[in-house]
């Protein structure tokens, strides 16, 4: 299981998603005077130090959590490559939905009502963007394994 390259890619995807859950994905500079508020996948930490769980951010948290869990589950389905490939496709779709939701929040189309101001990007917002690349590489590895098994079956 661990010697397969797609296992390493999926494990890296899990780690990247988990890190993305715990680090800020954006900062909001207030319109007036004050300190910046940090936006996490679950909510907003205001400049005064208060935590506000935002309904706007909950879909980000759910999508990234499900993505991490699906990537972890996919690692242990190494005996069933077809299911592994379909879960990889679903995982990539969820990650694309996360990126779309984040961009809508970043552009202000979906506002965060807890704080007002201009939102900026933080480093952790790049982590869920790297994750679909890792899952796509894992998908390619699983697909190559499937082709190899089919070729071996034809030889017999």
Language-model regions: role of each:
Residues 2-9, 53-60, 81-88, 113, ...:
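Membrane-interface helix-boundary signature
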Residues 42-65:
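Interfacial helix-start motif at the membrane-water boundary
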Residues 19-44:
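Membrane-helix exit/juxtamembrane interface segments
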Residues 11, 72-95, 154-156:
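Cytoplasmic juxtamembrane regions at transmembrane-helix boundaries
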Residues 70-77, 104-108:
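Membrane-helix exit/interface motif
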Residues 99-156:
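Alpha-helical transmembrane segments of multi-pass integral membrane proteins
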Residues 4-27:
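N-terminal signal-anchor transmembrane alpha helix
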């Amino acid at each position: 299981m661990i010697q397969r390259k797609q296992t390493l890619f999926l494990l890296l995807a899990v780690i990247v998603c988990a890190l993305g859950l715990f680090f800020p994905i954006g900062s909001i500079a207030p319109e007036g005077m004050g300190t910046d508020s940090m936006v996490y996948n679950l909510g907003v930490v205001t400049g005064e130090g208060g935590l506000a769980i935002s309904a706007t951010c909950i879909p980000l948290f759910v999508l990234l959590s499900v993505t991490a869990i699906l990537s972890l589950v996919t690692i242990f389905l190494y005996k069933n490559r077809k299911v592994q490939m379909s879960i990889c496709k679903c995982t990539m779709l969820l990650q694309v939905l996360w990126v779309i939701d984040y961009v809508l929040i970043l552009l202000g189309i979906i506002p965060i009502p807890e704080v007002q101001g201009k939102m900026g990007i933080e480093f952790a917002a790049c982590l869920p963007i790297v994750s679909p690349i890792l899952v796509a590489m894992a998908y390619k590895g699983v697909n190559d394994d499937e082709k190899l098994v089919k070729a071996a079956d034809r030889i017999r």
